[in-house]
Amino acid sequence: MTSGVDSDVSCRGCFGRWCSGEDCCEIEYRNNSGAYGYTAMTPNLGTANKVVPLDLASPNVNGEILCQKGSYMASYGNVEVEVKFDFNFCRCCCAGMGFAVQKIVGSGVVFLCASGTVVQKILGPGEKILIDTDCILAYSATCDLDIQRASRGVMGFVGSGEGFFNSSITGPGIVWVSESIQNISIYLGRSSD
């Protein structure tokens, strides 16, 4: 952080941030000097190695995204971190996002932390994509999240390694998919013998 950049702590919207996997308070950095300055940051998740910038004002986003808990890193401009509760029992338990979903709204730019390769897919109206439940990073609030059986038979559930369900997201909107942080953590924890 350069000189002239001041920090302050804000607890505005703390309940929504806390329910969506963030700290109750957030640090706000401001350059009050009038000269060029910067603040450097890194992802805060154990194996996250990517910073994904998303412009909330872009046409396919329409000012609101839903994302994985704890993936919010930073933002600038008009951005609020909130919570959206999903009361559909099957979706809460099996779609990979949980009961309290992180909702980010505004017209600024948000930075999410992710792991591995990040893929962005623009979905047209009614277009659907199936995703491993651990790999959803974020999606436009205009999209619909649901679940779909991963396999038709019992042997597929038991032997495929996919579990019982995949997440299905239907457009219009944008979906961001990344490698599962849980899977990378397991891989990194193994010995190299």
Residue locations for each model-derived region?
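Composition-driven recognition of glycine/serine/threonine/acidic- and proline-rich low-complexity segments
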Residues: 1-193
